[in-house]
């Protein structure tokens, strides 16, 4: 085998391998048989260079008939405490099309990231046709003994019990696997974190940053695996002066690690480098929320829910007002949640004055802030029904029901509208939903020589909407729903938390399917999406196994979903005591999700016949928790789990969910044996004694 090379170092040593300079040219990532192969984070010994995208220009592969020159962007080389970066451009010989590649190498992690933008430098003429554009095209060398490689992924969110279950594809020599999401929402089909395993301890994770339709191809040639990642459909010319962005891709190496160890490292990378931070640079923590539907019949119902929480000293830190609070004056029925009209008035962001006579939500917002909680409000800014008043003067602001974020005037209008509501109500958590598939709209809009442009402009506009909001309200938390977990990708995770990771949790479901999904989503998804959660209303009161299957780094409960609790009836003393017990423990667990996440089992699927377990450890606090589930049909009565971050010669105080405590040695805690009855769990908190 060849010496170990990082993707960037390979380019330094063999620049003619770049796809910009040769037909179907490849960059070689060399895998080492001794276990330490893979990407090497750039440092003084491995200077940062670039890997060019691949595409056709006017029907010819870039680097053959169409010549492109390359250049460093002056002043682009920069370094921070977390990463080093630089930018380069490649420009067509016709002087029109220019591709800019922004590269970033992360310190302390085997990770490199590529962000791509295309510009027409001409002020008078369109470019030639760019097609089959791939933000990343490279070749990964395989071990000499390997004839097959494995691609591990998670299914996306489709409101089914099988959301986020693992899938594994074996790619034999001479075969390929193509994954894509075609509807326009990034995690509808697959979660775009694609794990290529070269053997049991080495491989690469490709994390796609694109909140639209992406496509990834993995082809095993026998000696290497060719990897191509980009938008699903591209065949366009750029208009004079026009700029668009393309998917970003993060490449993260697994070097001599088990897959569980690798997921712990990647989770740490996400916390250190990707999750949203406030104006002081601090990670914005996950939330524990109590919710009221926006479609309540009177504002007093919202106030009653808040008062219930205050009187019973519930540990919630956020008050959540969901859909249904907006639209032309109308009276809602006494529904327990959002009411029957929540979808009818989307796009009309006037407060419903029949329910809220003041014409705003200040009575509840002010009361929430007075009680010391954060105020969350639901929006769906990208969709607009026929009820929207703006359509009378600006019908061009939407296409179908999709607000045209590629139209600067439409984008400014929705920004001014939503930002104004945020300012008036001092909103702490902005919740963004998106309940449509935009892909068909984009395909209808695109001309034959502009395929992909409507999508690219909409996605860029959506990022600008969120980024401008962050600049204006630097301490706001953005939350990303999209019909429950259908827009989970690297770009959105860097901007928002997700507290409705699947809509399958809404309402009671057959047997334990919702609770198994809860376990799966936390174990399988948290390495990529550290701050997540879902609705609690699928949980029967008093069912601890169900409750802690659902509780994650964040959780939300709507009390009225429990047979109209608070709104239509008083919650009983027993119900209140159980809610308080569960959520006091959830609040205790929450800070540990800010530390190291250790999967204690491999990814679990939808079956009821396995154990599921994970651990959250805070090295800075010398404490953490671990939780273990024996599902209903699991045959093993006991399991021994290897916990992470435990000091073998230390003493630990261990406290179980039932309140029992004992002191154990680190070696015992590190190899923790759990004996459980079917359909039961054990939750243990530990700290150095």
Question: At which residue positions do the language-model features occur?
Answer:
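C-terminal beta-strand-rich structural cap/linker in extracellular carbohydrate-active enzymes
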Residues: 665-689
């Amino acid at each position: 085998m060849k010496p170990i090379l990082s993707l960037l170092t390979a380019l330094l040593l063999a620049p003619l391998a770049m796809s910009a300079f040769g037909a179907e040219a490849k960059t070689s990532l060399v895998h080492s048989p001794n276990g330490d192969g893979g990407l090497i984070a750039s440092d003084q010994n491995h200077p940062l260079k670039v890997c060019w995208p691949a595409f056709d220009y006017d029907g010819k592969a870039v680097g053959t008939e169409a010549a492109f020159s390359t250049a460093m962007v002056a002043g682009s080389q920069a370094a921070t405490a977390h990463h080093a970066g630089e930018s380069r451009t490649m420009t067509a010989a016709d002087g029109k099309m220019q591709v800019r590649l922004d590269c970033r190498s992360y310190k302390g992690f085997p990770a490199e990231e590529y962000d791509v933008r295309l510009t027409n430098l001409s002020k008078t003429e369109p470019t030639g046709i760019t097609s089959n554009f791939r933000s990343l095209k490279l070749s990964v060398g395989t071990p000499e003994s390997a004839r097959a490689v494995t691609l591990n992924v998670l299914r996306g969110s489709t409101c089914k019990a099988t959301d986020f279950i693992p899938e594994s594809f074996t790619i034999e020599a001479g075969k390929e696997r193509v994954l894509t999401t075609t509807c326009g929402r990034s995690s509808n089909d697959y979660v775009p974190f694609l794990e290529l395993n070269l053997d049991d301890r080495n491989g690469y994770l490709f994390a796609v940053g694109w909140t639209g339709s992406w496509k990834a191809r993995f082809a095993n040639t026998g000696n290497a695996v060719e990897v191509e990642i980009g938008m699903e459909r591209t065949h366009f010319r750029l208009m004079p002066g026009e700029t668009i962005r393309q998917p970003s891709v993060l490449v993260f190496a697994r070097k001599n690690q088990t897959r569980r160890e690798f997921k712990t490292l990647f989770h740490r990378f996400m916390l250190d480098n990707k999750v949203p931070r406030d104006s002081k640079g601090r990670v914005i923590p996950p939330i524990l929320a109590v919710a009221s539907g926006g479609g309540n019949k009177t504002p007093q119902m919202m106030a009653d829910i808040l008062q219930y929480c205050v009187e019973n000293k519930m540990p919630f830190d956020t008050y959540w007002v969901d859909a249904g609070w907006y639209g032309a004056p109308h009276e809602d029925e006494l529904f327990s949640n959002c009411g029957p009209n929540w979808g009818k008035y989307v796009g009309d962001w006037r407060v419903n004055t029949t329910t809220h006579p003041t014409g705003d939500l200040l009575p509840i917002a002010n009361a929430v802030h007075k009680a010391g909680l954060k105020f969350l409000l639901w929006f769906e800014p990208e969709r607009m029904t026929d009820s929207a008043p703006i359509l009378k003067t600006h019908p061009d602001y939407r296409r179908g029901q999709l607000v045209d974020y590629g139209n600067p005037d439409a984008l400014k209008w929705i920004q001014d509208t939503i930002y104004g509501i945020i300012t008036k109500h001092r909103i702490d958590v902005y919740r963004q939903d998106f309940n449509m598939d935009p892909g068909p709209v984009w395909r209808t809009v695109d001309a034959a020589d502009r395929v992909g442009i409507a999508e690219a402009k909409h996605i860029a506009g959506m990022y600008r909407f969120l980024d401008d909001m962050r600049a204006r309200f630097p301490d706001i938390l953005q939350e990303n729903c999209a019909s429950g977990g259908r827009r989970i990708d690297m770009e959105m995770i860097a901007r928002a938390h997700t507290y409705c990771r699947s809509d399958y949790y809404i309402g009671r479901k057959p047997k334990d399917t919702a609770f198994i999904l809860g376990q799966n989503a936390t174990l399988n998804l948290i390495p990529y999406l550290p701050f997540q959660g879902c609705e609690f209303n699928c949980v029967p009161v008093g069912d601890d196994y169900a409750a802690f299957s659902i509780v994650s780094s964040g959780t939300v409960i709507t009390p009225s979903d429990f047979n109209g609790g608070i709104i239509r009836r008083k919650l009983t003393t027993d119900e209140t005591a159980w809610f308080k017990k569960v959520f006091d423990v959830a609040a205790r667990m929450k800070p540990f999700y800010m530390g190291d996440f250790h999967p204690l089992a491999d990814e679990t699927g939808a079956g009821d016949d396995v154990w599921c377990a994970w651990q959250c450890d805070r090295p800075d606090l010398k404490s953490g928790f671990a939780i273990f589930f024996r599902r209903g049909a699991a045959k093993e009565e006991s399991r021994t789990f290897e916990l992470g971050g435990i000091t073998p010669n230390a003493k630990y105080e261990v406290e179980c969910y039932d309140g029992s405590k004992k002191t154990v040695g680190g070696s015992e805690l590190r190899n923790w044996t759990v004996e459980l009855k079917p359909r039961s769990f054990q939750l243990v908190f530990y700290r150095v004694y």
